[in-house]
């Protein structure tokens, strides 16, 4: 059975960029998302994540908040300030307090997933974020209906 066979109904394969300095979390997230049919890009630092986002333009970015050198807040700020990556939806996954998570949302994240996460719940949450962002982008790109020309 292929990995795509495990995808939730109505959800095509998406590219998800995961940015986390913890190699165990990075590999766990990668395995879970691949098992649900997604293409996963891995970035062990914020800087690598930003470079991958610019080059690959994933459908969704998952970013950890607590990382050395460049934390999640700085990563989100850089992504949202860049014309190439500005529209890519970003979800924070963090063990931070609710106040910190809210700062990430105010900085541009569309939401957050608390750590530690349940392996059975994470793919469903990612699917919900993808469905919401795909629906929003479809509404934004659908041209308005043209009215038939009227005779003078």
Predicted feature descriptions by range:
Residues 27-35:
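Charged docking surfaces used in two-component/phosphorelay signaling
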Residues 67:
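Receiver (REC) domain active-site loop signature in two-component systems and cognate sites
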Residues 64:
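Active-site residues of response regulator receiver
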């Amino acid at each position: 059975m292929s990995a795509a066979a495990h995808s939730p109904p109505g959800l095509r394969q998406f590219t998800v960029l995961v940015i986390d300095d913890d190699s165990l979390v990075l590999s766990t997230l990668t395995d879970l998302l691949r098992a649900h049919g997604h293409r996963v890009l891995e970035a062990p630092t914020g800087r690598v994540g930003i470079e991958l986002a610019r080059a690959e333009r994933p459908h969704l970015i998952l970013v950890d908040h607590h990382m050395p050198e460049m934390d999640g807040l700085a990563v989100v700020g850089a992504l949202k300030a860049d014309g190439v990556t500005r529209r890519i939806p970003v979800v924070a996954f963090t063990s931070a307090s609710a106040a910190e998570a809210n700062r990430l949302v105010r900085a541009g994240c569309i939401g957050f997933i608390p750590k530690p996460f349940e392996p059975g719940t994470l793919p469903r949450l990612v699917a919900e974020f993808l469905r919401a962002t795909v629906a929003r982008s479809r509404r934004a790109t659908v041209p308005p209906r043209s009215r038939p020309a009227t005779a003078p």
